[in-house]
Amino acid sequence: MKKNIARRAAGLVRDHNMVFINSGSTAFLLLNFLADANVTILTNNGRSIFKKPSTKASVVISGGEIFEQKKSLVGDFAINSFSKARADICFLGVGGISKNGISTYALPETAVNRVILERTTGHRIIVTEGFKVGRDSNFHTADCNMITHLITDHTADPETIAYLKSIGVKVLFIS
């Protein structure tokens, strides 16, 4: 399911885009589908250093303190890296998304995710499996009006989907 979500998300990226990708596992899979794209990717996903080098895409790792639980890069260095760039499009994996907002399990990641959203001028996209839609995780990252798209599957909570559509979020379902 995650792979199909990532494949659908990659289809929204255009040549020469600057792309932010957070440390979420679904967002991480995007790297596979963008390897041959003519883009620049900035990520705080520590696992990205183990990916096969891309033939076209330029992958920049944010730096920062390693948050061992998620293999993500967090803290001032990570925040500073994203603060000094501006993206055309961003992709965030989340712990939950509901009427209460976007949330994550990891407190150190909330500030990085917020900066990713704030520094993106175009599409701000949540990529997540349906069971996380309608669910709140431990730490609030941002309100739902900060995002433009949600890519998920048909198991997503219908009430949350209706709410997101009512505030202008475009919802894309994968099979």
Residue ranges of predicted features:
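HTH-adjacent hinge/linker in prokaryotic transcriptional regulators
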Residues: 1-25, 31-36, 52-57
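Short glycine/serine/threonine-rich phosphate/pyrophosphate-binding segments
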Residues: 27-30, 134-136
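Conserved phosphate- and dinucleotide-binding cores of soluble alpha/beta proteins
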Residues: 42, 46-175
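Short, contiguous clusters of charged residues that form electrostatic/catalytic patches at enzyme active sites
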Residues: 3-7, 11, 28, 76, ...
